[in-house]
């Protein structure tokens, strides 16, 4: 594997991490709030 390819894969991984973690945290937070409001 070339260094540019590994850097590309690395940036893809970090991009996924940076996007997915806040998104799932927000979804969890919203679903928890929604559950409280409905009951």
UniProtKB/Swiss-Prot annotation:
One of its GO terms (cellular component) is photosystem II. The keyword Transcription regulation does not apply. It is found in: Plastid, Cyanelle thylakoid membrane. It comes from the Eukaryota. It is a single-pass membrane protein. This is Photosystem II reaction center protein X. Coiled coil: none annotated. Involved in the binding and/or turnover of quinones at the Q(B) site of photosystem II (PSII). PSII is a light-driven water plastoquinone oxidoreductase, using light energy to abstract electrons from H(2)O, generating a proton gradient subsequently used for ATP formation. GO terms for biological process: photosynthesis. PSII is composed of 1 copy each of membrane proteins PsbA, PsbB, PsbC, PsbD, PsbE, PsbF, PsbH, PsbI, PsbJ, PsbK, PsbL, PsbM, PsbT, PsbX, PsbY, PsbZ, Psb30/Ycf12, at least 3 peripheral proteins of the oxygen-evolving complex and a large number of cofactors. It forms dimeric complexes. Belongs to the PsbX family. Type 1 subfamily. Pfam families: PsbX. InterPro entries: PSII_PsbX (IPR009518), PSII_PsbX_type_1_subfam (IPR023431). The chain crosses the membrane at residues 11-31. Keywords: Cyanelle, Membrane, Photosynthesis, Photosystem II, Plastid, Thylakoid, Transmembrane, Transmembrane helix.
């Amino acid at each position: 594997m070339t260094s540019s390819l590994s850097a590309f894969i690395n940036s893809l991984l970090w991009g996924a991490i940076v996007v997915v973690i806040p998104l799932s945290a927000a979804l969890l937070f919203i679903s928890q709030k929604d559950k409280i409001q409905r009951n």
